[in-house]
Amino acid sequence: MESMFEDDISILTQEALGPSEVWLDSPGDPSLGGDMCSASHFALITAYGDIKERLGGLERENATLRRRLKVYEIKYPLISDFGEEHGFSLYEIKDGSLLEVEKVSLQQRLNQFQHELQKNKEQEEQLGEMIQAYEKLCVEKSDLETELREMRALVETHLRQICGLEQQLRQQQGLQDAAFSNLSPPPAPAPPCTDLDLHYLALRGGSGLSHAGWPGSTPSVSDLERRRLEEALEAAQGEARGAQLREEQLQAECERLQGELKQLQETRAQDLASNQSERDMAWVKRVGDDQVNLALAYTELTEELGRLRELSSLQGRILRTLLQEQARSGGQRHSPLSQRHSPAPQCPSPSPPARAAPPCPPCQSPVPQRRSPVPPCPSPQQRRSPASPSCPSPVPQRRSPVPPSCQSPSPQRRSPVPPSCPAPQPRPPPPPPPGERTLAERAYAKPPSHHVKAGFQGRRSYSELAEGAAYAGASPPWLQAEAATLPKPRAYGSELYGPGRPLSPRRAFEGIRLRFEKQPSEEDEWAVPTSPPSPEVGTIRCASFCAGFPIPESPAATAYAHAEHAQSWPSINLLMETVGSDIRSCPLCQLGFPVGYPDDALIKHIDSHLENSKI
C-alpha cells in the first residue's frame, strides 16, 4: 500500500512536455512505426485509468477503516507497542461529546437496570412467600391424601369383615336348610363375596340400601346375629361418612387458604401504591404549609413595619411642633421684647429699653453662618467661653440648637472665635418661679445629652433602612454580625462621622440642627463656631433626640447621609416620653423604667422584641 502511494505514476501528453522535449515513440521518430506508437500510448492510458480507479477504491476503503479505527479507539482506547496511547487531536471535541452522550446513556441504562433489579427483588420476595405458602398447601394435601388412604384401607378391612360375616351367616343358613330339607327343596348355593367394590358402593350409597334385597335372607335368621351385623354395618357406614366429610372440609380449607393468599397479594400491592402516594401528598402538603407560613409571616412583618414608619413620622411631626412651641414660649419668657423683635444683631445694655445704648458690632466668624431666631449676643444664661465677649446682654436668650459665639458670664462652651464687642457684665434678671418652668426647661434639667446619644447608637430603624439613597455606603443589617445590634461605645467626635472623615463645623451642625418656623422678626444670623459641639451643653439635647428625623431640605439631608449610625425609632419614642415625665416606658410592651435605668439595658430590652419578631 505504501509503495503504491510512494510511486509517482503519471502519464503526460505531448503538449504537457514542452517544445524542446519530444516523444521517444512519436510518429516523427523514424526508428519506430506509427502503429506501435499508438498502441503503446493507448495501453499506457488504459493502465493509468485502471490504476487510478484502484487507487481511488483503496483510498475510500482506507478512509472507512480509519473512521472505524477512531470509533473503536474512542470506545476502547488502544496502547501502542511503545506504551503511548493514540490520540487524535482532530476529533477531541467530537470524542468528548460522544463520550458524554454514551456516559449519559449508560447512566440511564444503569439506573433503569437498578430499578428493574429492585423490582425483581421485590417480585422474588413475593414469589418466595407464594412458594412457601404453596409448599405448606402441598404438605397439607399430602397429609390429607395419607389420611384418605388410611381411611380407604380401613373401609376395605371392614368390608372384608362384613363379607366374612355374610359367608358365615350363609353357611349357618345352609345347615338349617339341610335340616329342613324334607320340608322344601334345597336352595341354590350363594356366590362367594369376591366383589368388594359392590359392597363399598352400597356403603357409600347410604343407608337406603336395605337388607331385604340380600340373597338368601330368610326369616329364620336369629334376631341377635342380625342386629349385630346391622350395627357393624352402620358403624362402617358412619366411619365412611366421617372420612368423606373430613375430605370435603380439608378441600374447602385448601380453597380458603388459596383465596386468602391471593387477597394478601392484592392488598400488599395496593398498600405499596397507596403508601407511595400518601408520602408524596404529605411532602407536597408540608412544603405548601411552609410556603404559606412564610408568606403570612412576611405579610405581618411588612404591615408592622408600615405601622412603625407611620408612627415614627407622626412622632417626628409632634416633636417638631412641640419644640417650636417650647422655643417660642421660652423666647417670650426669657428675652425682652426689644431684643426679640430686633432685625439686626445688637448689644443691649443693662439699662431699661427706653434708654438707647450704642450698638455693638456683630460677631464675626470665619465659617458660614445660619439664620437663628435669636441674635448672636450672649446672655447670662449661657456658658463661658475662652474667647473674649463680643456682645454681652443682660437678658436671657432663648435656647437654640446651635450655641452662639458671643461670650457671657453664664457657663458657655468654648469657642476659638475672637472677641468683637466686649461689654461689661450686667446683672442677670431673677429666674422665673418653679411653677412657671416650661416643658423644655424641665427637659434641660435631665442628665447630659452625651449619655443619651451614647446609649442610642444601636441598630438603625427599618424606616431608615428603607431609604437606600441615604445609606448607600452602609452595609445591610442582615450582613452584620450579631454584636452589631448592641450599642457601640464611640467617641463623641466619631458619632456622626467616620474615623477617616474631617469633622467640619458646618457639617457637624447641619446634620443635627432643628428647623423652626421663621418668624417675621427673626432675621438675625447665628455664628457657627469652628469647634465641635460639646456634649455638656444643654442646647444639644434638642438635637440629640431630633437627629433621627429626616430633614427635608438638601443641605441637612446631605449631612444626614454622612452619618454612620442613625438613632432608631425606640430611642425617639423613649426620649419624647422622658420630656414630660420622670418615667420611661418600652414602646412595644409598655413596661415602665425609671429615669436612672441604664440606657444600654433598655436598648437590649427593645432589641429582644425586635429579634423575636424576625422570621
Curated annotation (Swiss-Prot):
Biased composition (Pro residues): 345-365, 389-406, 416-435
GO cellular component, one term: serine/threonine protein kinase complex
InterPro entries: CALCOCO1/2_Zn_UBZ1, TBD, TBK1-IKBKE_adapters
Pfam families the UniProt entry points to: TBD
Coiled-coil ranges (or none): 48-162, 221-276
UniProt-annotated stretches for the region Interaction with TBK1 and IKBKE: 280-329
A GO molecular-function descriptor: zinc ion binding
Region listing for Disordered, in residue ranges: 326-458
Modified residues (Phosphoserine): 184, 365, 372, 379, 385, 400, 415, 504, 534
Residues covered by region (Homodimerization): 1-279
Distribution of this protein across tissues and organs: Detected in leukocytes, lung, placenta, small intestine, liver, kidney, spleen, muscle, heart, brain and at low levels in thymus.
Any single GO BP term: type I interferon-mediated signaling pathway
Disulfide bonds: none
Residues given in the record as Zn(2+) binding sites: 586, 589, 605, 609
SUBUNIT field: Homodimer. May form a heterodimer with NAP1. Interacts with TKB1 and IKBKE. Weakly interacts with DDX3X.
Role noted for this protein: Adapter protein which constitutively binds TBK1 and IKBKE playing a role in antiviral innate immunity.
Name of the protein: TANK-binding kinase 1-binding protein 1
